């Protein structure tokens, strides 16, 4: 009888423990919280830099690095300019446009279109609730790259100093 009660208690504790882990590891509360973000969170001028790899059809990794400046309009639209290169082939001062969808939990998706080539790329984005900075990772096949952006303040003619 005592052994049956012990087994029942142990099983109950295991079920409770697994339930707790499922609730807290399966869906972290902080990742699902409404942090107040929206497309309006990204507004202003941002500087960025990132590096990574492009992987061609034969599986050959080609190193790449880029930096540039982007202007977000606070309505999910933006424009930017970058310089960078992949595997030693450099592109300078290339313009592009893009759209962002920022969710209340400060995650989102971005789509960019290169002005010259029409190439379309995609990112997942993770935004600070203040909109001061964000990180991103490319989600297109064959691109392994991530980076960050930080909002900067400009006055007409020269950078503003904090």
Describe the function of each predicted region.
Residues 2-16, 22-23:
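Bacterial N-terminal signal peptides that target proteins for export
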Residues 26-162:
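Mature soluble binding/inhibitory domains
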Residues 1-2, 131:
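Short alpha-helix boundary/capping motifs
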């Amino acid at each position: 009888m005592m052994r049956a009660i012990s087994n029942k208690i142990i099983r109950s504790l295991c079920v409770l423990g697994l339930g707790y882990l499922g609730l807290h590891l399966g869906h972290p509360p902080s990742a699902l919280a409404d942090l107040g973000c929206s497309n309006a969170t990204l507004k202003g001028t941002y500087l960025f830099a990132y590096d990574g790899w492009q992987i061609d059809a034969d599986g050959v990794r080609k190193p790449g690095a880029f930096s540039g400046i982007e202007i977000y309009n606070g309505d999910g639209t933006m424009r930017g300019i970058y310089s960078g290169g992949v595997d030693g082939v450099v592109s300078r001062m290339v313009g592009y446009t893009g759209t962002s969808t920022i969710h209340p939990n400060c995650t989102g998706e971005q789509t960019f279109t290169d002005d010259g080539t029409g190439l379309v790329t995609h990112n997942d984005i993770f935004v600070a609730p203040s909109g001061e900075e964000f990180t991103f990772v490319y989600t297109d096949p064959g691109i392994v790259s991530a980076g960050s952006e930080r909002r900067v303040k400009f006055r007409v003619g020269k950078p503003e100093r904090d």
